[in-house]
Amino acid sequence: MKQIINPLKGNNNKVPIWFMRQAGRYLPEYKKVRETTKNFLDFCYDVSKATEVTLQPIKRYGFDAAIIFSDILVLPHALGWEVDFKENIGPILKQFKSQEDFKYLQINPNYKLEKVYEIIKKVKKELPSPISLIGFAGSPWTVMSYMLEGKGKQDFKTSKKFIYENRILAEELLNFITEKTADHLINQAKSGADILKLFDSWSGVLAEEEFTEFVIEPTKKIILKVKEVFPKTPIIAFPKGAGLLYEKFIKEVPIDVLAVDQMVPLKKMKEWSDKVIVQGNLDPVVLLTNKEIIKEKTYKILQVMKGKNFIFNLGHGILPETPTENVEFLIEYVRLYEEKNSNSTF
């Protein structure tokens, strides 16, 4: 049985481990391949190169899962929306402002998404059988907020003002993205993804009413639509920064796995693991420190989550400046803990 699936099947003696952004800029072998293609989106659609970098962290570290190398913005890009990535700036998008802007969105995605599915098929063929393959998409609110802001990592005043003042239009855009996201995930599962993940990076900026309408409801719709076709495919949801609303999310969304950020108390993770598989939540900055600190912080998580339904991961993506030897040490430490499975320190 695939290692990462074990907790989902009631076998929680193992501690599956993988990292968000495990294929990325902290790896020298990734940088070498990335330098061969100037445009980031072209790199995401390059079947050979995206396959290679997806497999790099598996070959180097032996993670229990590979996550396909792609980006949450390939979906709007494939639907005809203007998306570009500027070096040292990040994503720049055409800004969605009015009903007129729907004319720039296509009903059916173009050939670009087929490249993503080809990458999944190719990785699947090359991936060792015990390793799970994770496909993913951005959750509708996060993708929508990029389109409304025209860029990422803002204070989201533009997005929130838009949904307050243009509720009907905002719901129309949300529903469109929700439908296309579900289709994208279904196609990834058809192509060979064992597990699917929804990244809602900006869910934490919303108040409860908007969180319910723009995070909980579309996530439910997506999961129910995917499960109609692939009822046994586990789905991970990551409503990052949800805070107290994580509990509402767990109660109302039929997820298999809840990914949590580093701000969530371990006591809450343990409590929630009786209801759902919990994934997380080491602070990525810990991996910038030293082995003693890494061991201390990791041990605390492992001890609290011992015997629970748990997948070890970070609270967010691995940072580009992370030393590769620290990643190796952390993985070895988790494996050693798993072997000993005792309360002793080591």
UniProtKB/Swiss-Prot annotation:
EC number(s) on file: 4.1.1.37
Pathways involved: Porphyrin-containing compound metabolism; protoporphyrin-IX biosynthesis; coproporphyrinogen-III from 5-aminolevulinate: step 4/4
Residues flagged as site, Transition state stabilizer: D71
Major place of residence: cytoplasm
GO MF, one example: uroporphyrinogen decarboxylase activity
Top-level taxon of the source organism: Bacteria
A GO-annotated cellular component: cytosol
Protein localization: Cytoplasm
Gene3D superfamilies: 3.20.20.210
Residues that coordinate or bind substrate: R21, Q22, A23, G24, R25, D71, Y146, S201, H316
Keywords from the named record: Cytoplasm, Decarboxylase, Lyase, Porphyrin biosynthesis
GO biological process: one example: protoporphyrinogen IX biosynthetic process
PROSITE patterns for this protein: UROD_1, UROD_2
UniProt enzyme class: lyase
HAMAP family linked to this entry: URO_D (MF_00218)
Function: Catalyzes the decarboxylation of four acetate groups of uroporphyrinogen-III to yield coproporphyrinogen-III.
Protein name as catalogued: Uroporphyrinogen decarboxylase
Organism (species): Rickettsia africae (strain ESF-5)
